[in-house]
Swiss-Prot record:
Assembly with partners or alone: Part of the 30S ribosomal subunit. Interacts with proteins S7 and S18. Binds to IF-3.
Entry GO MF terms: rRNA binding; structural constituent of ribosome
Summary of the function given for this chain in its UniProt record: Located on the platform of the 30S subunit, it bridges several disparate RNA helices of the 16S rRNA. Forms part of the Shine-Dalgarno cleft in the 70S ribosome.
Biased composition (Low complexity): 1-11
Keywords carried by this UniProt record: Ribonucleoprotein, Ribosomal protein, RNA-binding, rRNA-binding
Database matches in PROSITE patterns: RIBOSOMAL_S11 (PS00054)
GO biological process: translation
Protein's name according to its UniProt entry: Small ribosomal subunit protein uS11
Family the UniProt entry places it in: Belongs to the universal ribosomal protein uS11 family.
Sequence segments annotated as region (Disordered): 1-22
Amino acid sequence: MPPKARAGAAVKKVRRKERKNVAHGQAHIKSTFNNTIVSITDPTGAVISWASAGQVGFKGSRKSTPFAAQLAAEAAARRAMEHGMRKVDVFVKGPGSGRETAIRSLQAVGLEVGQISDVTPQPHNGCRPPKRRRV
């Protein structure tokens, strides 16, 4: 005899992953001094897949390396290609070391890279920058 559900017990809803069929999209690469985050979106800006150097498995100062950015871009691109992504326009933001490496790895995985734009925000004399490092 199967066990009966208790009265008032919460029923867990399982959310199934839906497969979006998007052939063309955008790759947003945010490369800071400490990490690199790659988000792949559809043309309207809704995120399809993302990956970061920390999510791929790097910790501490190794997150800021070009190799970590390469693995993060590959992981995000593979996940986006499962949803049918074939071509991306790349938007790069930030001064980090993983900018070019991430773009190259998007191409190496098999995504066709269209235009590449640098959308790094430039202050019009806004916030005071961090003090100079004394090493």
